[in-house]
Amino acid sequence: MIALYKVAAPRLDRTAKAADEVAAYERIDSTHAKARRLIERGRFARNDDGGIAITVVAAGAMDDARGRLGRPWACVPGHSFAISFIVTIPESVATDDAVNGWMSMIAGLATLDAIEGTLDECGAVPFNPECGFHLKWPNDIYCHGLKLGSTFTQVASPPDRHGDVAVIFSVGVNLSVPADRLPTPESTSLRMHVAPLPPTAELIDMIAARLVASLRTRLKAFVQMPLIQSSRLRSEMHHVCWMMGRQIDAQLIDGRTIAGKVVSLNDDASISVRTASGETERLSTGDIGLMV
């Protein structure tokens, strides 16, 4: 028999002040799956005046966390940040292929906002002055060239849509995961790179509250002016995109494999990859199965 860790629902006092609703549980299958169920039942915050309402779904432990394409999502109770955020945006924006790829980038950029803002508040500094945070397109968070976490963005339809859809932004970050419990040799944890930091429970609340604030600000601007904000997001991503100029091997959902150099981040949040034959392949966020 496998003994389950005794866990408690996370205390998110700061986050409760920043968000419209917080649903915190001791142990569930996954915050993302729970968020989908809340959406199906219409049990999440909405804002009738056109603002961005945010519902936070958190748990002390998850028994079946899943990321993109149903892949297992590593989460160590008491050491990981793993929270889902529910928002509503106009369906016209969420279904517009010219701009909707940027929603995944917004999740990553908001996560960087939250982490970097929290480190500033704590007075935390990196052990290595060259240590920095980047985003690996389309959904990974990198620290000093190693995977610190990832995001998962998914659109869901509430029962009464009224021209809007719900979007789930799930964010996972290794905060204090010991080296021997990291999921891969290419993974890392925040405490391995910066100090001082508060206890992990407090750190989770600080990051979550800042993530709510950043998501609200970024999404409000995005839904008001999608094309203008897409251009601004593209410029911002160029500064933090870990993949620009690098060689990649991408396994696509359709079964193909593309290998080559990332040469551009495009207006619709896709990337262009130049293969060994000199041809350029355009890849969207929805094309990717696995990328190394």
List PLM regions with ranges.
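N-terminal lobe of the biotin/lipoate ligase/transferase fold
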Residues: 1-120, 124-131, 201, 244, ...
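Residue-level signal for inorganic ion chemistry
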Residues: 31, 83-85, 111, 140, ...
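Short beta-strand segments
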Residues: 58-60, 84, 136, 152-154, ...
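Acidic (Asp/Glu) carboxylate-rich active-site/surface patches
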Residues: 103, 107-162, 172
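Short, acidic (Asp/Glu-rich) active-site segment that either coordinates a divalent metal cofactor
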Residues: 160-194
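Conserved, helical-rich catalytic subdomain that frames metal- and/or nucleotide-binding sites
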Residues: 195-255
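Conserved RNA-binding domains used in RNP assembly and mRNA/RNA metabolism
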Residues: 244-292
